[in-house]
Amino acid sequence: QVQLVQSGAEVRKPGASVRVSCKASGYTFIDSYVGWIRQAPGHGLEWIHWINPNSGGTNYAPRFQGRVTMTRDASFSTAYMDLRSLRSDDSAVFYCAKSDPFWSDYNFDYSSSEEGTEVTYTVSGAWTLPSVFPLTRCCKNIPSNATSVTLGCLATGYFPEPVMVTWDTGSLNGTTLPATTLTLSGHYATISLLTVSGAWAKQMFTCRVAHTPSSTVDNKTFSVCSRDFTPPTVKILQSSCDGLGHFPPTIQLCLVSGYTPGTINITWLEDGQVMDVDLSTASTESQGELASTESQLTLSQKHWLSDRTYTCQVTYQGHTFQDSTKKCADSNPRGVSAYLSRPSPFDLFIRKSPTITCLVVDLAPSKGTVNLTWSRASGKPVNHSTRKEEKQRNGTLTVTSTLPVGTRDWIEGETYQCRVTHPHLPRALMRSTTKTSGPRAAPEVYAFATPEWPGSRDKRTLACLIQNFMPEDISVQWLHNEVQLPDARHSTTQPRKTKGSGFFVFSRLEVTRAEWQEKDEFICRAVHEAASPSQTVQRAVSVNPGK
């Protein structure tokens, strides 16, 4: 029997390499050409190359030229494919195939493969996560005397394989029947069926879907059948502000009303992450045939003023309902705007002299005095601040007040407030700032020189990608032979959100021909609170190719 057996599925990072083997048996290895074909999600079959096992001659598809090498070891009846410089679009199902004996290299087509095997190779981050759906019958369609019932779990739209589907059946015994199919889009779908017997009517079941390549897990808990129900209305209300300018905790009240009585679960999220806090949840109240309940979340001013989004998430009958809230942008009288900036990581961790700045813009010139007053939420005294006024070309006035803060005070989470008053303002403007809360992640730094470009022979561009850091506060410097360059020498973008939960920035530095001909070294340095041990991560790059 003819068999072609490939090496197992693998996950590789972008830029890495992978070696695939295909061992043949059941025929004379040197009599038939061996080749590889791949199918990426949402695409058709694509020929990569073939090899003549007898002579070692190869033929490669143009788009893979230079990135693929095919070899063979006739003594082991094995062909090898080495794929280099992997990209995200290299994630695909790869098929190893053989030709009819002694076929011409001009008539290769996919239908000529007598035997073939498939295996999936994935570039890290290029996978698609499964969507998971419970499959149940309507309760009214299940006979009252039924001794067993079948329910299912559908995982669809994922790539690559595999997923593992398991069930939590409590004290009941069950049997499962998994089935996997490849959809027209190139993604996979799996259905797992569970048949249970016994006292199943009031039992809840959990379907656990684990996507092995991405190391993600999705759980769905549901009952054996679905009933008609009225879904809840979810609304968040919050306590009123203190008009005296004080900063008491705020109360977020989540009202869940108008739903058919049944089990309900309420969870609070902060920027999409489950909050580990003590909640006050009222007991369910009946409203005729419907029910209502509520959950209360208390937030400190530090958290509320951090501009984070808070979500009340309600799980009911296998469905999710939610409402979200965040601090509204402060309204400013007469177009006046006030901004409060946090200290830069460079000032905080390198210079050890952090400052925060209160900036007031678009003030109309008048004889009255603009007062900027600093305070701390702890009530402790503040340092002496410096003040600067500047008249703009449009006739408005800009006022800046800079306050030195203690490094330890800032790191430990002190909240600072700037209060702006003026005789012509109907009310004071209040701004607060504190250390960003939430998860921490150190930056990844990649520095490289761009290729020379025609017409730019007197210059060379160095680039620095800094990514996957949290929170977003970061400082970027360039060093030339270990001497820091002025900020005016380079351009750095503002932090932007990645598709995940982190941030990234891109920095660009132009160097002269004289600098790179001296074989000088340039360093891109990122200063961030999560970097260890000294809050800095740096990468060196030489624009001289011989270095």
Swiss-Prot record:
Pfam families tied to this protein: C1-set, V-set
Protein's GO biological process: adaptive immune response
Intrachain S-S bonds: C22-C96, C139-C225, C153-C207, C254-C312, C358-C418, C464-C524
Location of the Ig-like domain: 1-120, 130-223, 232-329, 333-437, 443-542
Residues that carry a glycan: N145, N173, N219, N265, N371, N383, N394
Location relative to the cell: Secreted; Cell membrane
Keyword set, alphabetical order: Adaptive immunity, Cell membrane, Disulfide bond, Glycoprotein, Immunity, Immunoglobulin, Immunoglobulin domain, Membrane, Pyrrolidone carboxylic acid, Repeat, Secreted
UniProt modified residues of type Pyrrolidone carboxylic acid: Q1
GO cellular component terms attached to this protein's record: extracellular region; immunoglobulin complex; plasma membrane
Main function: Immunoglobulins, also known as antibodies, are membrane-bound or secreted glycoproteins produced by B lymphocytes. In the recognition phase of humoral immunity, the membrane-bound immunoglobulins serve as receptors which, upon binding of a specific antigen, trigger the clonal expansion and differentiation of B lymphocytes into immunoglobulins-secreting plasma cells. Secreted immunoglobulins mediate the effector phase of humoral immunity, which results in the elimination of bound antigens.
UniProt name for this protein: Immunoglobulin epsilon heavy chain
Organism: Homo sapiens (Human)
